[in-house]
Curated annotation (Swiss-Prot):
Top-rank lineage group of the source organism: Eukaryota
Biased composition (Gly residues): 118-127
Segments of skewed composition (Basic and acidic residues): 1-14, 143-154
Function: Specific inactivation of TRH after its release.
Name the UniProt record assigns to this protein: Thyrotropin-releasing hormone-degrading ectoenzyme
GO BP annotations, alphabetical order: peptide catabolic process; proteolysis
Gene that specifies this protein: Trhde
Species name: Rattus norvegicus (Rat)
Amino acid sequence: MALDGERGEQEEEKKKKKKKKKRKKKEEEGAEKSSSPFAATMGEDDAALRASGRGLSDPWADSVGVRPRTTERHIAVHKRLVLAFAVSIVALLAVTMLAVLLSLRFDECGASAAMPGTDGGLGGFPERGGNSSYPGSARRNHHAGEESSQREIGEVGTAGTPSAHPPSEEEQEQWQPWTQLRLSGHLKPLHYNLMLTAFMENFTFSGEVNVEIACQNATRYVVLHASRVAVEKVQVAEDRAFGAVPVAGFFLYPQTQVLVVVLNRTLDAQRHYNLKIIYNALIENELLGFFRSSYVIHGERRFLGVTQFSPTHARKAFPCFDEPIYKATFKISIKHQATYLSLSNMPVETSVFEEDGWVTDHFSQTPLMSTYYLAWAICNFTYRETTTKSGVVVRLYARPDAIRRGSGDYALHITKRLIEFYEDYFKVPYSLPKLDLLAVPKHPYAAMENWGLSIFVEQRILLDPSVSSISYLLDVTMVIVHEICHQWFGDLVTPVWWEDVWLKEGFAHYFEFVGTDYLYPSWNMEKQRFLTDVLHEVMLLDGLASSHPVSQEVLRATDIDKVFDWIAYKKGAALIRMLANFMGHSVFQRGLQDYLTIHKYGNAARNDLWNTLSEALKRNGKYVNIQEVMDQWTLQMGYPVITILGNMTAENRILITQQHFIYDIGAKTKALQLQNSSYLWQIPLTIVVGNRSHVSSEAIIWVSNKSEHHRITYLDKGSWILGNINQTGYFRVNYDLRNWRLLIDQLIRNHEVLSVSNRAGLIDDAFSLARAGYLPQNIPLEIIRYLSEEKDFLPWHAASRALYPLDKLLDRMENYNIFNEYILKQVATTYSKLGWPKNNFNGSVVQASYQHEELRREVIMLACSFGNKHCHQQASTLISDWISSNRNRIPLNVRDIVYCTGVSLLDEDVWEFIWMKFHSTTAVSEKKILLEALTCSDDRNLLSRLLNLSLNSEVVLDQDAIDVIIHVARNPHGRDLAWKFFRDKWKILNTRYGEALFMNSKLISGVTEFLNTEGELKELKNFMKSYDGVASASFSRAVETVEANVRWKRLYQDELFQWLGKAMRH
């Protein structure tokens, strides 16, 4: 609830009348004193605010200070006015003295009074989504799940009273520090002493935080972040033993999630003070702040408490300066029952055991760090450990049964190697004495890179070799590589503000592939898999008119969560890869080493990176203004499509044009920011010329204008041109039809003349250009005719990913079978050649067999998805054998395909069998694919049953429920069911996932991306209107996507089916 209430027309009218009366009264009096109870505590104007030119506006200034005025009457002052003025001064002095005495008394006794009716217990925990302050102790009279009476959100409290009146509406001026998105900067935290006591039996905790703060500018307000915590007591003292600074009052301001402490005197600039806050709160049953999770072992449910503070949720666990720029040191102590252990960023320094079965762990002091990657956990887990060459102790904590099975051994092994790799690559040692990896059953994200205590959801770190596929091993590997990179990019060097979150997430995402190449050199991740898993995926998203720049302004608190999306992660990574390629990898590496060395333990912005990389280039004799080039890529949304046209009238000359690529031209004309846009990029276009037997050496052309002519050597009538070699650049390339025909001919005659990455890039560009209307619909389908001769995984993977959305656009059409048969025809030869894998898994041969096994898996998936009879028969046989023998002999790398195919083809008994196995298995990788297989059924009753079960947290983990709904939406038999379920349950889903990064946007996108009829578009728009403002960016993208689907079907589906009809007859 807003602190200043809602503004109605009657209130506005009253205010106008009140202001008129005030002006009249001021003409007759020399001064007046504010009637606001809160204003009485204000006293003098803040000197710092006046000095900075941000003085108080007249109405506010009149309410907080004595401000005599003269009138236009005779200059002599009436004796009665003088007498009244004198009396008012005396009265003001008396009231002030009384207030000071009372505040000192209140400072001594604190806020110990309980709310009426609570008998000294809790005064009411804040409700979900709210903010409140309540007195009492967290350890008394509270049971999990109780709902207590709640105080009004935003109440003002003083050091001696539970409440006072909040500032009036007229007092809400722009300068007020608590109304701003960013903290004022008047105060800077230097060190936190944080003492916590966790009561796991009733899921509450109490805390005391002592913050040493430096006053940068004089101020009478201490403003720091706090949300969903009950503040009991606040004290401020000067660092030099000058005694307490009297606290006039404090209040929570939920609009900006801050705690405001109003002082009776100004804090002096360039002095240090100590801020002490005593508070308590819930260990939430949600996924943010300090929350609880659980697991079952030997039939007993056990609980653990764990934190998730990024980006703005540390304030839910303790009052703090919760912005990345405010780095400080932390000393944490956690008191808990001795049956638990506690973890934090640093090692335990001492543990103090008490006779009552409690223990207090005191952790070593941290280096300078931001609040968002502070962390702690309280659990019953066990661990295994190893040590790096430099002496860093690495431990993996997990459920005792997982540790016994060795499920964490793989992660522990590669983490040790990765720390050593990054230390060598960055030439900056790992900064802490230890790194703990914590595997938890419930977490909002795959993992979180807390410094020294990285937290992972179990599915992204535990690996059981007996039931894990190569694909699962790759997923686990890349998540770990990502999080370990964050110990440097993000933790050691932190972005100044959230607009540049890509500075940490883009680098961590890019190094997923670099680091995995270090572990498995033959996998060629950065040169190959990066294309399909990052570049092609994010260009789909960034080709929408509703996209945004990778660096986007954060103007409101609600904007912070929005910057954490695939644009920041994947586009950030793609731009870093492009930068590394045109700089040269060795120069780029030296630049990163300098960047980390210069800014370690501090903050950096994108210009700091650009300047460091430009200097690295200069030292290598190259002069490129990196900032000038990269600002166009990071501050503009989208990306260009380069079109290369051969000029038949002038030998060896080509025309190169660039324009902003948008999938839906209609959306481009409707988007105001894109109308008449003059987006231009400086594009490092690499280019080669070739023919059937020869390819020229690579050349680079910097394209910076809308159109340019260039001379190309070796270009004749029989030669083709290929741009963006190996897709190192973040753009698409189109050609005239003649060049497309020459490239198709080259692929069919001898595809190996082009590199694997170039072949994959051509496939993706062709499908995307056709989807947007830049190319005839037959061109991409003609390109994939060569796949029957393709022996490499990457082009097949690119084709599979490109065909998937096209398949979903067509799968409910009457003549869908024509498309289906065409794809089966392209797959049949390779499927027959490769066959099915054997049922074995040997970790030692994973590295050697990766490319071949992933190719086989991709082709089997296509064959089964499009209805190859042999593939269906094989899957059914394997499932039936498992059911009859109760021995699972299905090859690990294709289990998900077999499970899904079997559920879709066979009867309800198979669904029930898979459902039973989902409940009984303890292997997290197996549990995941069993759950997803249940969504493949053709039985709508079973799909509806599964959707309803997905919201039961005891059956399906919160983070997995989204995947269930999305997978049902991808099933043509369940698309409308998932869409209806999503709308019916939206309030529940939004309450559960609304604050968690990615989750809402992932859900909205997954449920709507394949809607493609006018009726579904209308339903989406109407639904969006009914929840105006909620997840608006995600819904806007969804509407644009569905509009593009509808538009494509209207304009191009007939053209596609006509060509397919002719192709199948020949």
